[in-house]
Every structure is written in C-alpha cells, then in structure tokens.
C-alpha cells in the first residue's frame, strides 16, 4: 500500500441484534455513512460473518468483499482476537476465558483449545480468499 486511504473501524464493538448492527450489509452502510473506508470483521459473530463458510467458499468471500465495496469500504482485517486468546489459556484463567468459546466446548479446556486452533486456521484460509477479491 502506497498511501493511507482513510479510517477503518472494528465492527465488533457495534455488532448487535438491532439494525443496522445485525447484518454485514447494514453495518457496512452505517460505517460508510460515517466516513469510514475500511472495516475489520469480527470472525466470531455470525450475524456479520460466517467464518467456516468463508474458509470453504471463494464465492462467499467474494460476496463479503463485494458487499463492503458496494458501500465504498475495504475489508482490512478478519479479527480473531477472542479465538486467538483461547489457543493457550493458563489453567488459572480457564473459567474467565471460557465465555469466549463456542458453547459446545465450554468447560472442556482441550476441546476449547482445539476449537480455537481450528478457528484461527479457518481465518487464515478465509483471509487468503478475501485477498483474492481485493484490488
């Protein structure tokens, strides 16, 4: 990148159950209306992004990038903040960190770690797919 194109926004802090914060297209429109040029997508929030699908489908990745582009936005990052923290959790913090995990693996540190590693791997693959769509 030879120049900064403008401000980006991390969507996780705004995602919610009410419009315009409950779908990727609507939250992109909202961000663009505020003057943002890029969005960082939280990969753990299925209201906005299906991480597994993005890791398996170039068409879905193209759709996500296209939706952002329709609003004059670029996908700047796929965030794995929460999943990444769960890759290696000290036993003293098991209870505190368990809430970040998928409900199916809570209370099982080994399953939680395997889930987290898989999530990060999916994000790596999805990120490669998204990059194929970005000019």
Annotate each PLM feature:
Residues 1-132:
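N-terminal pre-domain/capping segments
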């Amino acid at each position: 990148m030879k120049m900064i194109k403008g401000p980006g926004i991390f969507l996780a802090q705004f995602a919610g159950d009410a419009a315009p914060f409950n779908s990727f297209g609507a939250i992109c429109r909202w961000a663009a209306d505020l003057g943002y040029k890029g969005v960082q997508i939280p990969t753990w929030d299925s209201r906005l992004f299906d991480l597994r699908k993005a890791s398996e489908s170039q068409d879905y990745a193209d759709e996500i990038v296209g939706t952002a582009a329709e609003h004059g936005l670029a996908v700047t990052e796929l965030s794995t903040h929460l999943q990444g923290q769960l890759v290696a959790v000290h036993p003293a913090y098991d209870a505190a960190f368990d809430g970040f995990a998928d409900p199916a693996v809570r209370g099982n540190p080994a399953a939680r770690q395997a889930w987290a590693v898989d999530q990060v791997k999916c994000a790596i693959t999805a990120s490669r797919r998204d990059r194929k769509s970005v000019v």
